[in-house]
């Protein structure tokens, strides 16, 4: 428990861009897997999504929007992750992030 009342660092837009990149860019997940852990994500839904992505990557499974939705549904975590629409929306966050750079 955080007893000094400081707010944890958070950047949901960056989290969304990272997750979106992992969904649509094959090179992104190996980089993320080397440096990120699910608990590093501030948003609970992002932790759930990244945990599934990481497990799929480590198992050698194909990662894309459809397979991640299926994996989350199989785990009973799809709604906690933001639902099918939320997962699909992550891919658009990558393009929007690039526009703002």
Feature roles, as predicted:
Residues 1-98:
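Noncatalytic partner-interaction/assembly domains of nucleic-acid and motor enzyme complexes
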């Amino acid at each position: 428990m955080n007893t000094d009342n400081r707010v944890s660092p958070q950047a949901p837009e960056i989290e969304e861009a990272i997750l979106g990149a992992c969904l649509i860019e094959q090179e992104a997940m190996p980089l993320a897997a080397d440096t990120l852990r699910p608990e590093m994500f501030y948003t609970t839904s992002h932790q759930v999504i990244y945990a599934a992505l990481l497990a799929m990557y480590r198992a050698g499974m194909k990662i894309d929007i459809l397979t991640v939705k299926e994996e989350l549904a199989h785990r009973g975590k799809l709604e906690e992750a933001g639902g099918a629409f939320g997962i699909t929306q992550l891919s658009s966050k990558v393009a929007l992030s690039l526009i703002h750079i």
